[in-house]
Amino acid sequence: LRYFWTEHATALYMLHAAVYCLYIIYCLYRSEFFCFSLAAVFAGFSFYFYSKGLGMNARTAIIAIVTALVLAAVALLANRAAKSKGSVKLFGKTVKVFPAKFNATVLYVACTVLGCCLVACLVLGSALFAYYCMFAAIAIELTGAVYYTFQLK
C-alpha cells in the first residue's frame, strides 16, 4: 500500500496545483485563457501519465480519448463563439462565453499543437517523446500566460 500511495502522490500534488491555478485563471483572466489553460492542463497530464511508462493500455487510451475530446470541445467552442461575437447557444438560450472581440486563432493554434503532440505520442509510442511533449504543453501554457497578461486592461 505504501508503494502505490507514494507512486501517485506526485500526480495528486500536481493535480492540486493545476486545479488551484485554473481557479486563479478563471477568477482573474478572460474566459478564453481559462479554456486555453484547461486544454493545456489536460494535454500536459496525459503526456505526464504516458511518460511514466504506462504504455498503450486501456488507461492510456481513455486518457488520450478524454484529452482529444477536451481539445475538440475547446476548438468547437471557440469556433461557435467566433461566429456569433462571443456568444454560444446552449439549450435554446444564448450564453456569453467570450468577449465580443476575442482572438479565436490563439485557441485554434494551441489545440492544434497539443493535438499533434498527442497523436505523435500515440503513434511513436515513446515515453521519452511524451516527456518532451509535457514540456511543450508547459511552454504553450506560459506563452498563453504572457499573451493574455498583455491583453489585460
Residue ranges: model-predicted function:
Residues R2-A17, A64:
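Structural signature of hydrophobic alpha-helical transmembrane segments
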Residues F42, R59, V66-V70:
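Detector for outer-membrane/organellar transmembrane beta-barrel domains
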